[in-house]
Amino acid sequence: MLHSKRREYTANNQDVTYTELKTCKSPWKHRIPTVKQSPVVLCEEQLKYGELTFHRTPQPQPRKQAMGRKRQGPKSTVWRVVTGMLGALCVVLMTTTGILLPKLFSSQEEQCRKTSLHPLRCPKDDASCDLCSSDWIAFGNNFYCVFKENTKTWAESQSACEELNSHLVIIDSKAEVENLLLFEMDGWILHKMDGTNSSWLWRNDIKIQNTLTNDSEKKNHSCHYLRGNLFMPDECSAKKSYICEFNI
């Protein structure tokens, strides 16, 4: 009886199949009657192997598609890196802009304020201008100067300012007060009590609240001077520094 077994091996993308052929002993001896041929007796078990080789056909891939995949890999990686770097740069720029813009605006406002208030110096050889003897601070069309060394009474201060073609400072607005405070100007100002209605009046008839209740105090403290952000009443005969104002 003939039996067959198959064993499969794979090497170098090839499938090799071995077929085992087995013959068994036969009780009958087969002889070939011809004289010329030698008798063949199958007495022993004989094994014969036949080798069958099958070639596996690889599936063809488009060459362009394979090359395209190889080329797309590095490019996509580079684009991702570039995109990430640009995103991080945008975040940094937005953060920096948000921090610097408020500082820039505040510095510009401060610079504009300082340019509107700047010391005025006249030429040294100009003897006709008495205002050039000291530094005057300009604010719009007004110029201010504080005389701290030679203290005078309120009347003497007003006369000294008139000799310079100016007058004691007249405060017309809150902004003017803030500018005087910025340069720390203290001294007599043109602010005097009106004896008719016992109210405090500016030179331009702008009223302020009466701070003195006693009539004797009103008469003795009828003059005003500026100290910091306060308007202090005092005796007009007291000697203090004074602030002159010159209008263009």
From Swiss-Prot:
Q: Which residues form a coiled coil?
A: none
Q: Which residues are glycosylated?
A: N197, N214, N220
Q: Which cysteines are joined by disulfide bonds?
A: C132-C145, C161-C244, C223-C236
> Could you tell me in which tissues this protein is expressed?
Expressed in natural killer (NK) cells.
Q: Which Pfam families match?
A: Lectin_C
Q: How does it sit in the membrane?
A: Single-pass type II membrane protein
Q: Which GO terms describe its cellular component?
A: plasma membrane
Q: Which ranges sit in the Cytoplasmic compartment? A: 1-80
Residues that span the membrane, as ranges: 81-101
Q: Where is this motif: ITIM motif 1?
A: 16-21
Motif ITIM motif 2, per the record, lies over 47-52
Among InterPro entries, the record links this protein to: C-type_lectin-like (IPR001304), C-type_lectin-like/link_sf (IPR016186), CTDL_fold (IPR016187), NKG2/CD94_NK_receptors (IPR050919), NKR-like_CTLD (IPR033992)
Please report the stretch or stretches of sequence annotated as the C-type lectin domain: 139-245
Q: Which domain of life is it from?
A: Eukaryota
Q: Which PROSITE patterns match?
A: C_TYPE_LECTIN_2
Q: What Gene Ontology terms describe what this protein does at the molecular function level?
A: carbohydrate binding
Question: Where does the protein end up?
Answer: Cell membrane
Q: Which residues lie on this side of the membrane: Extracellular?
A: 102-248
Keywords for the protein's UniProt record, in alphabetical order: Cell membrane, Disulfide bond, Glycoprotein, Lectin, Membrane, Signal-anchor, Transmembrane, Transmembrane helix
Q: What is known of its domains?
A: Contains 2 copies of a cytoplasmic motif that is referred to as the immunoreceptor tyrosine-based inhibitor motif (ITIM). The phosphorylated ITIM motif can bind the SH2 domain of several SH2-containing phosphatases leading to down-regulation of cell activation.
Oligomeric state and partners? Heterodimer with KLRE1. Interacts with PTPN6.
Q: What does this protein do?
A: Lectin-like receptor for natural killer (NK) cells. Heterodimer formation with KLRE1 mediates inhibition of NK cell cytolytic activity.
Q: What is this protein called?
A: Killer cell lectin-like receptor subfamily I member 1
UniProt organism field:
Mus musculus
Annotated gene: Klri1
